[in-house]
Amino acid sequence: MLEIDGSYGEGGGQLVRTAVALSAVTGQGIRITNIRKNRPSPGLKQQHLKALETAARICRAQISGLFPGSTEISFVPVEIEGGKYDIDIGTAGSITLLLQCIMPALPFAKEKVELTIKGGTDVAWSPTIDYLQHVTFRALEQLGYSGSITLKEHGYYPKGGGKVSAYFKPCRLREFHFLKEKEDIKGSSHASNLPAHVPLRQAEAASKRLMEAGYPSLIETQSFEAFSIGSGITLWIGYIGGSALGERGLPAEKVGKNAADEIIPELRSGASVDTHLADQLIPYMALAGNSSYTVRELSLHTTTNIWVTEQFLDVKFRIEKKEGLFEVSVS
């Protein structure tokens, strides 16, 4: 059984998600200790538990240590099965982070996998559902990944209530070298149970800030009724994105500007992928082989994901500084 120190590097939930996904792919049983050891509230939270439970269901794994606050788990997979699964994370637990825990394994499933997931689609400290759909999936398609998601309903913190359907087919991943895409910025600004002018103001503020920086954009707006109150905006171009969520007392103009200010440094750098996508791509690139990208900043999430991935797979990542950017490659 492979022993993984859960406090290594970034030491958060992502390390656990990547380790479990690659355990499923390789069939290697694992024991992860010191999970979220240095966090204010160490151990597993509800959304981590639901992700691990889902991964265990899909690959018929034996799993122990699955309880709130647990700092150690063991996970022994059998085989990755297909089929249909209904998952309710509860409240506003992140749907996108749950998917991160299982998506790297799904190309190796025996048959197609269909998921219906309830939870949070737009919550803090996780990719928005629009980011996953328009940035992450676009990048994964280049690596031969076969999957899609359909947003049924937005769900915001703290009530959640979002709903997503997802569909994945077994596939063979292929190598790809990511280059900067040249096109206009697109976006989606949305709000539920709020005045219709809220998403409009978010979009207008983002467009204005982007144009001041020299980047034209086309941002769609949506206003609707849903289970929870909230707003958000996501911007994307190629393999680069930026997003911001509304908060009580935060003007809509500030939300839009925050999203623009997140994507502008990424665009100015000339990197092929943004700093968030950079860490997400690591396990897929390792499974595909001979792939690369450039990124403006090497985050602790990325270096941690590289370390975890190299524990499971016979690959070696290389990091080189080139013209002010970091080139990350695997062979």
UniProtKB/Swiss-Prot annotation:
Cellular component terms, GO, for this chain's entry?
A: cytoplasm
The record ties this protein, via InterPro entries, to: RNA3'-term_phos_cycl_insert, RNA3'_phos_cyclase_dom, RNA3'_phos_cyclase_dom_sf, RNA3'_term_phos_cyc, RNA3'_term_phos_cyc_type_1, RNA3'_term_phos_cycl-like_CS, RNA3'P_cycl/enolpyr_Trfase_a/b, RPTC_insert
Annotated Gene3D superfamilies = RNA 3'-terminal phosphate cyclase domain, RNA 3'-terminal phosphate cyclase, insert domain
Matching Pfam families: RTC, RTC_insert
Q: Where in the cell is it found?
A: Cytoplasm
Q: Which HAMAP family match?
A: RTC (MF_00200)
Among PANTHER family, the record links this protein to: RNA 3' TERMINAL PHOSPHATE CYCLASE, RNA 3'-TERMINAL PHOSPHATE CYCLASE
Name by which UniProt lists this protein: RNA 3'-terminal phosphate cyclase
Q: What are the leading ranks of the lineage?
A: Archaea, Methanobacteriati, Methanobacteriota, Stenosarchaea group, Methanomicrobia
Q: Gene name, please?
A: rtcA
